[in-house]
Amino acid sequence: CQLPNIILLCCQIVSNTAIDMQKLLSLPPNLVSAFYELENVDRTEWFCTSDPVGMKLGSGGGTTWLLREWQKERDRKYLAEERIPTEKCIPTEKSLPAEKRILLHAGGQSRRLPGYAPSGKILTPIPVFRWARGQKLGQNLLSLQLPLYEKIMERAPERLRTLIASGDVYIRAEKPLQEIPDADVVCYGLWVDPLLATHHGVFISDRNQPESLDFMLQKPSLEELENLSKTHLFLMDIGIWLLSDRAVDLLMKRSQKADGALDVDTPYSDLKYYDLYADFGLSLGNHPRIEDEELNSLSVAILPLPGGEFYHYGTSRELLSST
């Protein structure tokens, strides 16, 4: 924002008020206003919103919307603290804040899990695990998810400031995390049965360079995986993606319409449907499936999650089997 005699760098909050790790959640519309009270969380560390009603943005466009709404809220709070009238503020181009952030996409309508549609899958209550430490009687999917994501971000190189994950999975790591490479994009995967991999995204790596992504596929057939297995290895995408600021900037850029026209009364008018996995992901790797010079140039590393376990809460059947 810009004012006479004042240059305000939006979203660059004074360092002594900065939070080390922000949690940004995309939730069902009816849960947004009640979330802070239900979970008893600090609004300076947590932010939640919902995708625009009636607008399908995809996981890529949804990430852009979530980050923009978060920045807008930070700006609003800053202006209020400084007692600067918002109507005098002229929007300017701004970069992402410096602290690390965890983004959870949990705004689905739960059509396949209707019992938890009102609260969203993210607050699904999970029974205490037998013989496990750190369990709580009131635990839910969110409280079980978060510790692993926080550990990953604590180990991540400084420029990997954004972690994006799904709100309808529970992922466990039974072994210590390995060192995280300093790449533009780092994704975690699991060695799984080929049949299971056909229902998810799959990272394909050359057998001579297993840590480097050759290309990504979405829900490949068994025949495809069988043919590739002679020369390649594959890991199932478990939905934990770390992005550098450069990668986030490009993701946000690709989520916008070509003309970039923004209607002040419709803040999402410049956005389009863009999927993090099927669009952005297929543009990554040494031999990407989608040609895009800027995205193709991003460095990518693939890590198997040590002792990893993957539980999906997408349907009522999966709720029972995963629990």
Regions found by a protein language model. Give the residues of each.
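Unchanged
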Residues: 3-323
